[in-house]
Amino acid sequence: LAALCVSLLCNRHRGIGADGLIVLEPSKIADLKMRIFNADGSEADCCGNGLRCVVKYKKQSIQIESLAGISKSLYTPSTISVTLPKAHIIKKLDIGYLIDTGVPHLVLFNPDLFKDAKKYRFDFNVNVTMFSSMHQPIKIRTYERGVEGETLACGTGGAAVALAYKEMYPDENLCTVLFASGESAAYSFDATGDLWMEGVIEHVFEGTYTLNKES
């Protein structure tokens, strides 16, 4: 897809309105392949909420290929759970943690939550996720690369905070995150070390959108 088409579809005035666009393709190594495009047209490696939306769309437990790897999933009518492929801490920094949850996140403790987020995003060329306390549910805010603004509920950002929480509290296997949207998600580690994200997904609408030269 051309970046201009993605930007148009994600535009909240002239298009459908979204933080990103998901394209599904056949896969040779999983049930299907997910490609995720940011609102500016750039392609991202992974999206935690995007993975869960795909499972909701298919209405079954499936394996999903993305640029980040293979994600497992569990489908129920009420909640969707997915794994974040190869999620790990890249490096501990003086200011926080650099973490890969399919996409890179800089995780910082900041009582002001969003202060200097844009600066850190460009200094490190990453998504920036800030938290104000490690008391659960952990309140977070994310400045997303490609969106170039706040994402009200970033699944991979929540996963990054869960990894930082696990690093600080090794005996804890469950972490609940509260997003700026007011929604929450639960993150847990299974016996193999895989990081699972679980939460509710709502079907908002469906329709047909026609792209043409005049759009």
Regions found by a protein language model. Give the residues of each.
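Surface-exposed beta-loop interaction hotspot
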Residues: 86-109
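Active-site glycine-rich loop that binds ribose-phosphate moieties when present
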Residues: 82-94, 114-116, 124
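A glycine-rich beta-to-alpha transition motif near the start of alpha/beta enzyme domains, typified by
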Residues: 1-77, 99, 106-215
